């Protein structure tokens, strides 16, 4: 009786451990043809994580397409350009589909543009590729001197 209880405890621990591993990595290797999902959310300040995921999926022959879920108001110009360039390279090997969330503006819109297909909700705020640069205007102060 004690051996059966220990056996079932070991099985439960193994199942819990494997479930935890799958939940952390979000990768389930079932089947031959897969679609990968990469989330790009918030302000784009760093490209390393997204580029790392894109490169990882580009090497995986079982991944046939990549969905980019973009929900970003933009961010830094350099990281957006780096992600854009990586998507252009990857597009030669895999299908790229962009799904726009609430906002895909500025850099979010820019990184979406090289995709094979872009899907947006009717209420998605999108567009406006550009850079805003604010400078102080001291023109009125010079009158006093």
Predicted regions and their residues:
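Small-residue-centered hinge/linker elements
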Residues: 1-95, 102-145
